[in-house]
Amino acid sequence: MAISLITSLLFSLPQQWQPVVLTGLLPVIVSLVLLARKGRLKMPPGPEQVPLLGNLHQLAGPQPHRALRDLARVHGPVMRLRLGKASAVVLTSAEAAWEALRGHDLDCCTRPVSAGTRRVTYGMKNVAFAPYGAYWREVRKLLMVELLSARRVKAAWYARHEQVSVTKPVVKFDFIHYCCMGKPVALDEHILSLSDGIIGTVAFGNIYGSDKFSQNKNFQHALDDVMEMLSGEGSSAEDLQLPAAVGRLVDRLTGFAARRERIFRQLDSFFEMVIEQHLDPNRAPPENGGDLVDLARKPRVLKKVQAEIRAAVGVNGRVQPDDITKLSYLRKVVKETLRLHPPTPLLLPRETMRHIQISGYDVPAKTRIYVNAWAIGRDPASWPDEPEEFNPERFEANEIDFKGEHPELMPFGTGRRICPGMAMAMANVEFTLANLLFAFQWSLPEGTTPDNVCLEEEGRLVCHRKTPLVLVPTVYRHGLE
């Protein structure tokens, strides 16, 4: 109606004035057309927004994946949010996530840019955060061919074997001490040291474990700061609904800009040291701990998986490459752990490069796509048989796997942006867990029952347990030969 009125008024003017008036009204006409088109879009439902923040205040806690699951129960599995100045859609069902990540893979396979991410990734040069394009394709190809291909993962068995040989005397001493004293042991540092050593050996032929950076508190704090910066939606005023210049000024006044620069310089100096010493700092929190916590709470499952491992290994005293392929129940335990405790509960966000539709809703270009893998893993629609319970037997009746081919279980994502390190990570997890379960019996500390074990996690980008993993080891007769 407004456009018709403008047209009528335009043609009522003298002919010589019409081009001048039309030029002046052109921006108004374009805006009216866009508004009319936007009014016809079927946008996903979502909670009310507040000025400047949008919905950021609803995700301010240490467990945004839980907060988003609760919001989705009210607004549905396809939910619209505004995170500062960024439009976002959160997907909390397997069907919606599969439609977006596989059905529209090419349409939404780039990454969003934020002030913090841009700085600590050297201008979005990190392969995980780089936007889709020629640079990302070339870097990912190089990574997959030279380090993370199936051939390289298989060839890296020497690293896992060597790391166990190097660190096992230390682990022996600590664990035997605790076994003799009947005391619980905090496993996080041991597992982290082993994981770091394997990665360092594979990447550079050097070991760096408990005697180096994995015990360096400054290094760990720097990595924690980086993770917070990478996941901190709205931490920078530049990410809010403010003009860019105003956002930068606010960041300087609040000290955020100085903190961001300090974190970047810490990270940069560490990388310089890594280059000089041929060490690789890239590592996620150890994933084996989640397996052991759940296993300690389920003695039946623990006994069953240990029996399988010990039957396969026999009296060799150490898990060998051929043994891993025989451990079908161990693989089910790992699947169940990834279902309940995905390492990245909210998969790294994607961003739409063009207008798409998800579950009948319109999703415009430049919209961020978040997939709540944690909520999907506990969704009764996908897992009808007690989804909150740890039960590896649920995988006996199906072929569901974590490799990105089943919408119910996508802890590493799917499509073009699936985690390139999945195969290497799982080889390390299965190897480490098999050795720990073979060598020791594990039980909960005195006074701790399966019902009062804290399973809550914290963290925004990568989650870890709120409380340390503490278990009581008992030596198995062949485990330390």
Residue ranges and their predicted role:
Residues 2-40, 427:
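Terminal signal-anchor or tail-anchor transmembrane helices
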Residues 40-62, 66-159, 182, 186, ...:
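Cytochrome P450 substrate-recognition site 1
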Residues 56-76, 320-360:
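Conserved cytochrome P450 K-helix E-x-x-R motif and the immediately C-terminal K′/meander segment
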Residues 112-120, 154-293, 304, 319-322:
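Cytochrome P450 heme-thiolate monooxygenase catalytic core
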Residues 195, 199, 204, 263, ...:
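Central I-helix of cytochrome P450 enzymes
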Residues 299-301, 422-464:
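Cytochrome P450 heme-binding "Cys pocket" and the immediately downstream C-terminal segment
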Residues 359, 396-429, 456-458:
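Cytochrome P450 heme-thiolate "Cys pocket" and heme-binding signature region
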Residues 371-401:
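Conserved cytochrome P450 K-helix/beta-meander segment immediately N-terminal to the heme-binding cysteine loop
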